[in-house]
């Protein structure tokens, strides 16, 4: 029983340290270009979906074409319920692996007979631990993946993969930015009358 308590304390300490260093899968530093002073182009992307390379390529091309634009990128967070499920699975996975390794039967604690899968896990500890680890990681990744690639210019949405269902091509993005920049220049040139 003491060992189980020790495993729970250790697992919660690991999760807390991971959460403070990497809140909900968000990279601890934002991806940004700080030397530009113009309008802010902000990307919110699903890093676990592999969109980081796409963002970096777009950032490179846009910074060459529009040197005055400030570009920021950050992870698009999933809904809180999915983040909590992923956090719970992370702790549960560690506790379950610890119980398998130690050989403690948690079902005896509740006065239940151990199911056959638990007995199989005790006979095949390495396979059982690997299966728990990979299955849990698969579910955690599914919970944390949003599929998002959202782009805003000065907090005005210009592209949403969640709405459109696909990433913008480089030509589409450049055309959108050209139109937005022309509109901004036009709006700035209109004299403002006070009433």
From Swiss-Prot:
- GO MF: thioredoxin-disulfide reductase (NADPH) activity
Family membership: Belongs to the SelWTH family. Selenoprotein T subfamily.
Q: Which GO terms describe its biological process?
A: cell redox homeostasis; cellular oxidant detoxification; glucose homeostasis; insulin secretion involved in cellular response to glucose stimulus; pancreas development; positive regulation of cytosolic calcium ion concentration; positive regulation of growth hormone secretion; response to glucose
One Gene Ontology cellular component annotation held by this UniProt entry: endoplasmic reticulum membrane
Question: Which enzyme type, at the first EC level?
Answer: oxidoreductase
Which controlled-vocabulary keywords does the entry list? Answer: Endoplasmic reticulum, Membrane, NADP, Oxidoreductase, Redox-active center, Selenocysteine, Signal, Transmembrane, Transmembrane helix
Alphabetical list of InterPro entries matching this protein: Selenoprotein_Rdx-typ, Selenoprotein_T, Thioredoxin-like_sf
Return the EC number: 1.8.1.9
Species the sequence originates in: Rattus norvegicus
Name by which UniProt lists this protein: Thioredoxin reductase-like selenoprotein T
Cell compartments where the protein resides: Endoplasmic reticulum membrane
What tissues has this protein been observed in?
Answer: Ubiquitous, detected in all tissues tested.
Q: Which gene encodes it?
A: Selenot
What the record says about the induction of its expression is: Rapidly induced by ADCYAP1/PACAP neuropeptide and cAMP.
Q: Which cysteine pairs are joined by S-S bonds?
A: none
Locate the cross-link: Cysteinyl-selenocysteine (Cys-Sec): 46-49
Which reaction is this enzyme known to catalyze?
Answer: [thioredoxin]-dithiol + NADP(+) = [thioredoxin]-disulfide + NADPH + H(+)
Q: What does the entry's PTM section describe?
A: May contain a selenide-sulfide bond between Cys-46 and Sec-49. This bond is speculated to serve as redox-active pair.
Q: What's the stated role of this polypeptide?
A: Selenoprotein with thioredoxin reductase-like oxidoreductase activity. Protects dopaminergic neurons against oxidative stress and cell death. Involved in ADCYAP1/PACAP-induced calcium mobilization and neuroendocrine secretion. Plays a role in fibroblast anchorage and redox regulation. In gastric smooth muscle, modulates the contraction processes through the regulation of calcium release and MYLK activation. In pancreatic islets, involved in the control of glucose homeostasis, contributes to prolonged ADCYAP1/PACAP-induced insulin secretion.
In the bilayer, the protein is annotated as: Single-pass membrane protein
């Amino acid at each position: 029983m003491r060992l189980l308590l020790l495993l729970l304390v250790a697992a919660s300490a690991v999760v807390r340290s991971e959460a403070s260093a990497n809140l909900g899968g968000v990279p601890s530093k934002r991806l940004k270009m700080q030397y530009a002073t113009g309008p802010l182009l902000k990307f919110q992307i699903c890093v676990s979906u592999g969109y980081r390379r796409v963002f970096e390529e777009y950032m490179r091309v846009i910074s060459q074409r529009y040197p005055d634009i400030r570009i920021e990128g950050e992870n698009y967070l999933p809904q809180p319920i999915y983040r909590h499920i992923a956090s719970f699975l992370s702790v549960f996975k560690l506790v379950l692996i610890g119980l398998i390794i130690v050989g403690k039967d948690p079902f005896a604690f509740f006065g239940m007979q151990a199911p056959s899968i638990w007995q199989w896990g005790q006979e095949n500890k390495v396979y059982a631990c690997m299966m728990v680890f990979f299955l849990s990681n698969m579910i955690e990744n599914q919970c944390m993946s949003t599929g998002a690639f959202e782009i805003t210019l000065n907090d005005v949405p210009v592209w949403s993969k969640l709405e459109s269902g696909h990433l913008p091509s480089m030509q589409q993005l450049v055309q959108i930015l050209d139109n937005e920049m022309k509109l901004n220049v036009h709006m700035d040139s209109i004299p403002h009358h006070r009433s």
